[in-house]
């Protein structure tokens, strides 16, 4: 099959220059040198026109091991330009949507308010720029989401069953867990809330201190206070110990 350069050479183009832009379909992406190059097949009426060699892809920002990495995939439609008009040196300058490669969003209502970055497997970042309804959503195919919602003044993190809501409007934070919540601080403090049994457990290597103007402790069933060392109960006012039967020692 011919290349673009071969075709121009055969037609008498001795300088083999091309000042226009060509459309092509990506056919290979596994660059043997890992330079981010692709191979493309020209989309022309000439079915004998073959594919390019390994060619580079333009990026809006890039340098050594950093930059904006959005690589074309096999089957993507791309636009090719030519370095200094040399048909031997094409490079990808962008992608195009087409009949078989439709865009991930639309402007059907005539309002350009939704901006989206989405992968082929449907992980996405969506920006809504609608007046007074601005929000940013980050989501995976399984529904793990982060929502930054200016309309409702809420930040939400969810996996579908468990959810964290931070409300700037009400000044509240709500954490909802389906089964179990564990909070760990360093290696010495653990707080566990078990949704199945209803138990709450606090463990620490040091001490637990409650300090308030008034503290009430009430159990609908049995209540016990036990210490492996000394236990002190002290009051600067009246102390009342009351029960249907009271045993001391």
How would you name each of these model-derived features?
Residues 1-11, 18, 23, 69, ...:
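Right-handed beta-helix
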Residues 27-30, 44-46, 86, 96:
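A generic structural motif
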Residues 33-41:
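Short aromatic-glycine-enriched beta-strand elements
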Residues 41-46, 51-52, 75-80:
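Catalytic cores of peptidoglycan-degrading enzymes
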Residues 54-64:
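Short, structured beta-strand/loop micro-motifs enriched in basic residues and often containing a Trp
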Residues 52-54, 151-152:
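Extended Gly/Ser/Thr-rich low-complexity repeat segments
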Residues 31-32, 71:
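Residue-level "contact hotspot" at macromolecular interaction interfaces
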Residues 13, 63-67:
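Alpha-helix capping and helix-loop boundary segments enriched in small/acidic/polar residues
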């Amino acid at each position: 099959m011919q290349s673009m350069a071969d075709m121009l050479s055969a037609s008498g183009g001795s300088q083999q220059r091309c000042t226009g832009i060509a459309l092509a379909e990506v056919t290979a992406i596994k660059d043997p040198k890992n330079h981010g190059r692709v191979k493309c097949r020209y989309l022309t009426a000439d079915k004998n026109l073959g594919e390019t060699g390994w060619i580079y892809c333009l990026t809006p920002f890039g340098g050594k091991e950093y930059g904006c990495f959005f690589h074309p995939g096999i089957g993507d439609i791309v636009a090719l330009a030519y370095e200094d008009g040399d048909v031997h040196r094409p490079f990808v300058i962008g992608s195009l949507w087409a009949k078989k490669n439709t865009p991930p969003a639309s402007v059907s209502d005539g309002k350009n308010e939704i901006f989206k970055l989405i992968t082929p497997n449907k992980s996405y970042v969506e920006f809504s720029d609608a007046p007074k309804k601005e929000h940013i959503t980050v989501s995976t195919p399984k529904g793990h989401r982060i929502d930054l919602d200016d309309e409702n003044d809420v930040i939400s993190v969810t996996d579908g069953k468990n959810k964290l809501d931070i409300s700037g409007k009400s000044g509240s934070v709500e954490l909802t867990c389906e089964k179990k919540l564990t909070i760990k601080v360093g290696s010495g403090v653990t707080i566990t809330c078990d949704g199945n049994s209803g138990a709450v457990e606090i463990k620490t290597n040091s001490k637990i201190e409650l300090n308030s103007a008034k503290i009430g402790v009430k159990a609908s069933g049995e209540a016990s206070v036990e210490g492996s060392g000394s236990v002190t109960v002290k009051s600067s006012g009246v102390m009342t110990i009351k029960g249907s039967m009271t045993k001391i020692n």
